[in-house]
Regions:
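Surface-exposed patches in mature extracellular/periplasmic domains of secreted proteins
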Residues: 5-18, 89-94, 174-181
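Acidic/histidine-rich catalytic neighborhood of metal-dependent amide-processing enzymes
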Residues: 62-158, 174, 182, 186
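Solvent-exposed loop/turn segments at secondary-structure junctions
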Residues: 14-17, 34-36, 46-50, 101-105, ...
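Structural recognition of the beta-strand scaffold that forms the well-ordered cores
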Residues: 9, 29-31, 39-43, 67, ...
Length: 244
């Protein structure tokens, strides 16, 4: 990221794990066009799940997963976006945030999920006030279908509409005009801190009846470069063809 961005900052912090251990964590903040006061934010989580608790094989449920889709897919798109921003300086300020420890929580316990975004939201500079934020999570599915996430609609309906209008304008049919189930993700702490942020996520990976989420099957062969390109294409249009 340092090869591309105008500035990169590491936000380091610690967390006490469920077994009392101290875990060292790091958020990464990359900024482009530092002089611009009109800014937008894109984010993803760069950690992966330390245990595959949803794996059909009980022997694998205490082992870490690769997280090719759940984690790496959003990061991959943002790394490529950073390269594009380096080659084509944006007309607006852009901040790319890579959050740590999104996936440390246990099922049905939200306390230890989204730790990186919670820390960032609690310690952000008063001057950090992007026009909107877009979170990428699980966007590499070969059967990509991104629906409107209910918490995004609740916190930032105008941003959801803007993104879906842009997707329709450019023929990105993977952005479906229906709602998904609500998701607790890194966009929640950001919205609670006043940063209007929506979550682009395809939780049905690959479908409702068979999910690789939080299992050892979340591997690169289940993901599609085409899906990554579709989401990346949307982001570039939002940056360079602005109307919000």
């Amino acid at each position: 990221m340092e090869r591309f961005a105008d500035a990169v900052n590491r936000q380091e912090f610690t967390h006490t794990g469920s077994r009392g251990e101290e875990i060292r964590l790091t958020n990464i903040i990359a900024s482009f066009n530092l002089a611009a006061t009109d800014r937008v934010m894109f984010a993803a989580h760069w950690d992966t799940r330390p245990w595959g608790d949803q794996d059909p094989d009980p022997k694998k449920r205490d082992k870490p997963i690769l997280g090719a889709n759940d984690g790496a897919s959003g990061v991959a798109v943002l790394l490529q976006l950073a390269k594009i921003l380096k080659q084509n300086p944006p007309p607006v300020g852009v901040d790319i945030l890579l959050f740590d420890a999104e996936d440390l929580g246990q099922r049905n316990d939200l306390t230890n999920f989204a730790l990186g975004s919670k820390y960032f939201a609690a310690h952000k500079a008063p001057t950090f006030n992007p026009q909107y934020g877009i979170l990428l999570d699980m966007i590499g599915d070969a059967q990509l279908e991104i629906k409107k996430e209910p918490n995004s609609l609740r916190y930032a309906p105008e941003v959801v509409q803007y993104v879906w209008d842009t997707a329709e304008k450019y023929g990105l049919k993977e952005f479906v005009n229906t709602t998904s189930g609500d998701t607790y993700d890194d966009h929640i702490p950001l919205n609670e801190a006043g940063i209007k942020t929506i979550d682009l996520i395809d939780f049905n990976y690959p479908d409702e009846s068979n999910r690789y989420w939080h299992t050892s099957e979340d591997t690169p062969d289940k993901c599609s470069p085409t899906s990554l390109q579709i989401v990346g294409t949307l982001l570039t249009h939002l940056i360079y063809d602005r109307s919000l």
